[in-house]
C-alpha cells in the first residue's frame, strides 16, 4: 500500500503542537507502510531544514513544493486569496472565513506524484488541506485528519465578542462548506471522541474514527517538586487559540497571582510575533519569552503549566507535554476537552480568572497536589500507550 500525506507546512523543526503531532506520526509510520510526503516551502531559507528532516525520516519519500519558485501574477486566484487573507487578518482584525485556494502548479505537482508513485491512499491534514479533496483524482482513497474543527473554533470565538453580521453569515457558509468537503472523503479521523460526535451530529456522513496525536513518552524523566515560583505556557502566537488564551490569562489572571506572590515568573515557549512580545513585556511584569527550545524538559522542569485555552477544538499537545514531564497543570474546560482528566484529582480545571489564579497558587504551595496528580496521569499515559 502506497500512502501519500500532504501537510500545509514542513513538519520540522517541530516548533509547535501541530508539527510535533505530524512529525511524531511520520516517525512511527515510516516503519509500517510505504509513505510519500508533500508539503509547501514558502521561503528559500526553509530548505536548510530539508536535509535534517530527510535524515530523521530515511524511509519516507519527501517532495517539498517550492512556492517561492512558482510565483503567480498579482491577478491570479492564489495571489488574490493571499491578499484578501492578509487584509482580513492584519487590517480588519477579523477571523478569515474564505475557502483556501491552491496554486495551479501545486495541484499539478500533487497529482503528478500520485501518478508517478502509484499512490493508493491520500491523507490530507489540517484545515488548509481540506479542500484538496476536490483536486485529487477519484482513483485513490482519500483520508482527512481533522486536528481542529474550524467552524467550532469560530463559534467559540464569537461567544467572546461581537462581530458584524457579515462575518457571522460568512462563518455559517464556512460551516456548510467544511461539512460538505468532509463528506467527500472516504475516511475522517478526529483527535477526540467529542469532535467525532460533533461532526456526526452536524451532518458528516463519511466514516469517522477518533485517534489522538501520537506523542513519544521520554525515558529517564522523574518528578521534581515545583520549588520555584514559575509557570509556563507552550505554544506560538501564530495559532489564534494560543494568542487568545495567553492574552486572556495576562489580562485577567496574572495580576491576581502576582498580588499574592510578586515573585512568580511566567515563561512562554514558542515562536511569538516580535511586536506582541514587545507590547506584552512593557505591559506585564515578570514575563519572559523563551522562543523555541531544544531541551523542553530542562525549561519546564519544576514549573506549573498553564493551558488557558478558550477557543478551538481538538486535543492539546501542551497537556500531553505536561504529563510527559511530570508538570502539574491548570487548564480550562475547553483546554482539557477530549482528555478525561479529573478536576482536583489529576489537574485543576477553571474557567473563571479567580478560580484559575487560585488553582495556580494552590499547586505552588501544596506538594501533595503537585505530586499525586502528575504521577497518576503519567502512569495512565504510559498504560494507554502500551495498549495502542
Which residues make up each language-model segment?
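Conserved small/polar residues in nucleotide/adenosyl-binding loops
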Residues: 377-384
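N-terminal subdomain of nucleotide-sugar transferases
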Residues: 1-64
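Conserved catalytic-core segment of nucleotide-activated headgroup transferases in glycan assembly
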Residues: 210, 215-279, 289-293
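Short hydrophobic beta-strand element within catalytic cores of glycosyltransferases
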Residues: 318-321, 328-332
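Acceptor-binding helix/loop patch of EC 2.4 sugar-transfer enzymes
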Residues: 8, 74-100, 143-176, 236
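Donor nucleotide-sugar binding/catalytic pocket of nucleotide-sugar-dependent glycosyltransferases
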Residues: 143, 151, 168-175, 179-220
Amino acid at each position: 500500500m502506497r500512502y501519500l500525506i500532504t501537510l500545509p507546512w514542513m513538519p520540522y523543526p517541530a516548533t509547535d503542537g501541530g508539527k510535533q503531532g505530524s512529525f511524531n506520526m511520520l516517525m512511527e509510520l515510516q516503519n509500517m507502510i510505504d509513505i510519500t510526503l508533500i508539503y509547501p516551502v514558502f521561503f528559500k531559507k526553509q530548505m536548510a531544514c530539508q536535509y535534517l528532516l530527510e535524515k530523521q525520516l530515511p524511509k519516507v519519500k519527501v517532495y517539498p513544493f517550492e512556492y517561492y519558485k512558482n510565483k503567480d501574477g498579482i491577478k491570479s486566484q492564489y495571489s488574490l486569496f493571499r491578499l484578501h487573507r492578509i487584509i482580513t487578518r492584519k487590517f480588519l482584525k477579523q477571523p478569515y472565513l474564505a475557502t483556501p485556494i491552491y496554486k495551479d502548479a501545486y495541484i499539478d505537482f500533487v497529482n503528478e506524484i500520485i501518478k508517478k508513485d502509484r499512490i493508493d491512499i491520500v491523507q490530507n491534514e489540517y484545515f488548509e488541506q481540506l479542500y484538496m479533496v476536490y483536486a485529487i483524482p477519484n482513483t485513490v482513497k482519500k483520508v482527512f485528519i481533522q486536528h481542529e474543527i474550524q467552524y467550532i473554533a469560530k463559534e467559540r470565538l464569537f461567544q467572546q465578542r461581537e462581530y458584524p453580521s457579515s462575518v457571522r453569515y460568512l462563518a455559517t457558509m464556512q460551516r456548510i462548506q467544511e461539512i460538505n468537503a468532509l463528506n467527500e472523503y472516504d475516511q475522517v479521523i478526529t483527535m477526540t471522541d467529542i469532535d467525532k460526535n460533533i461532526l456526526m451530529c452536524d451532518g458528516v456522513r463519511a466514516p469517522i474514527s477518533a485517534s489522538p496525536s501520537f506523542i513519544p513518552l521520554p525515558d529517564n524523566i522523574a518528578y521534581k517538586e515545583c520549588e520555584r515560583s514559575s509557570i509556563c505556557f507552550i505554544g506560538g502566537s501564530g495559532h489564534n487559540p494560543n494568542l487568545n488564551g495567553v492574552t486572556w490569562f495576562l489580562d485577567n489572571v496574572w495580576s491576581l497571582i502576582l498580588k499574592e506572590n510578586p515573585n512568580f515568573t511566567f515563561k512562554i515557549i514558542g515562536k511569538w510575533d516580535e511586536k506582541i512580545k514587545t507590547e506584552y513585556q512593557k505591559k506585564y511584569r515578570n514575563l519572559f519569552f523563551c522562543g523555541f527550545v531544544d531541551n523542553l524538559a530542562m525549561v519546564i522542569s519544576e514549573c506549573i503549566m498553564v493551558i488557558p485555552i478558550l477557543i478551538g477544538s481538538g486535543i492539546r499537545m501542551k497537556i500531553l507535554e505536561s504529563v510527559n514531564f511530570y508538570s502539574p497543570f491548570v487548564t480550562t474546560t475547553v483546554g482539557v476537552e477530549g482528555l478525561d482528566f479529573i478536576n482536583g484529582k489529576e489537574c485543576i480545571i477553571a474557567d473563571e480568572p479567580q478560580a484559575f489564579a487560585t488553582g495556580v497558587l494552590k499547586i505552588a504551595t501544596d506538594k501533595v497536589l503537585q505530586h499525586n496528580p502528575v504521577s497518576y496521569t503519567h502512569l495512565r499515559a504510559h498504560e494507554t500507550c502500551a495498549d495502542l
